[in-house]
Amino acid sequence: MAKKPAPTEKRIVLPGVSWQQFETLLDELGQNRTARLTYDRGKLEMMTPLEEHERCSRLIESLMLVVADEMEVQINAIGSVLLKRADLGCVAQPDASYYLTEKIRLPNRAELDLNQTPPPDIAVEVAITKSSLNRFAIYAALGLPEVWQYWTTIGDHVLKGNLLIYQLQNGQYVQCLNSPTFPFLPAKRVLEFLDQSDKIGLAQALTVFRSWIQEQRSLNT
């Protein structure tokens, strides 16, 4: 019996889309849309994420919340919010974004105008298929200071991917071994957590990870 092909993320690219047309499309799709949108000066890409995509994003968020809790840092997890700069003609929609401040006031909607609101401190992108647009050029234009990009594949090895952490420096992204926001946290430790969550379960993996953070803090005091 022939093996059923694995599902894959679908990306649709539309050229020649004006900003006004893009805004009209946003209104038509509504705030409960499932597609991830990327827009770069007339080119629009729409991608519908698979469940594996969302699973990775949720696991990384659970890790991020533990880090903030242990470091006693206020964190605002705003999910997959659309980040816009109309003056630049740029829009990106990371899988998750985080503000590490209690002072920020966010509008109650599924998009942020970065001319009115500062960009999130950390953005997370899960990459299963490659975008046809230069997303990092868009992230740089939007001024996102730190981006985590988790590359993986569909199937049993979805939690055995590769995490790349980037910091914006002079308009360009530079790869870092550790998170610039949390210097004690290397990308490889995040990968270990993802692997452990698959092997021993999320609750136990979070307990192990929390203990590890506490050890790192004690070493630096």
Can you say where each PLM-predicted feature lies in the sequence?
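Gly/Pro/Ser/Thr-rich low-complexity, intrinsically disordered segments predominantly at protein N-termini
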Residues: 1-221
